C-alpha cells in the first residue's frame, strides 16, 4: 500500500473515495468537491483509495495529489474490493466527519453541506443517503437491492 500526503491535522471533513478503474471521472469529481468545500469554507481532505486499478487511475491520482494539497492517495497492489478500500480510507481519515463517495459521480458533492450539517446539528453518529432515482445498469442496482434487503433484515432499519 502506498500513501501520499500524510500530514496529520484535524479538519471538518474527510471525503473517502474508493475507486477501481475510474480515471475518466476523477478530474471532474475532485474539481466538483473542491468547489463545494471552498463555497462552504470547510477544512477537508479527499482520500482516494485505488483498489488495484488496471487503467490510468493511479497515475492520474498521483498528478492530482501533487496539484492539490487536500488530496491524499492510497494504492492497493491488487483489487481487494470496495469494503477493504473504505476500511483503509476510514483508518486514515482525519476529519471530524467522514463522507464516502463513489468515484463514478453517481453521488453528488453538492449534498456534502447538508450531510455535514445534519451530523453536526442533530448529534448523529452516522447518517446514510440514497438516490431517489438511479441511472445505474442492472448489474449495479440488483446487488444494491440485495444489500439493502439484508441490511433491513438484520438492522431493522428500512434502507
What are these regions (language model features)?
Residues 12-14, 45:
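Cell-envelope/extracellular polymer assembly enzymes that use nucleotide-activated donors
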Residues 22-37:
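Short, well-formed alpha-helical segments that are part of the catalytic scaffolds
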Residues 22-25, 53, 82, 108:
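Donor nucleotide-sugar binding loop of glycosyltransferases
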Residues 24-28, 55-64:
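Acidic helix N-cap motif at the loop->helix transition within catalytic regions
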Residues 30, 34, 42-53, 74-75:
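Short beta-strand/loop segment that forms part of the nucleotide-sugar
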Residues 50-59, 105-106:
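A conserved acidic beta->alpha catalytic loop
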Residues 72-78, 82-92, 97, 109-159:
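Acceptor/aglycone-binding surface of glycosyltransferases and processive sugar-polymer synthases
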Amino acid at each position: 500500500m502506498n500513501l501520499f500526503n500524510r500530514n496529520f491535522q484535524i479538519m471538518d471533513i474527510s471525503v473517502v473515495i474508493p475507486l477501481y478503474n475510474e480515471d475518466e471521472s476523477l478530474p471532474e469529481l475532485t474539481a466538483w468537491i473542491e468547489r463545494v468545500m471552498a463555497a462552504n469554507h470547510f477544512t477537508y481532505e479527499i482520500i482516494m483509495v485505488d483498489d488495484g486499478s488496471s487503467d490510468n487511475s493511479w497515475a492520474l491520482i498521483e498528478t492530482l495529489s501533487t496539484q492539490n494539497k487536500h488530496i491524499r492517495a492510497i494504492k492497493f497492489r491488487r483489487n481487494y474490493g470496495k469494503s477493504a478500500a473504505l476500511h483503509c480510507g476510514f483508518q486514515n481519515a482525519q476529519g471530524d466527519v467522514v463522507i464516502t463517495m463513489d468515484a463514478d459521480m453517481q453521488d453528488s458533492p453538492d449534498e456534502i453541506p447538508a450531510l455535514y450539517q445534519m451530523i453536526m446539528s442533530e448529534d448523529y453518529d452516522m447518517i446514510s443517503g440514497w438516490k431517489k432515482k438511479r441511472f445505474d445498469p442492472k448489474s449495479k442496482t440488483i446487488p444494491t437491492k440485495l444489500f439493502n434487503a439484508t441490511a433491513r433484515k438484520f438492522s431493522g432499519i428500512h434502507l
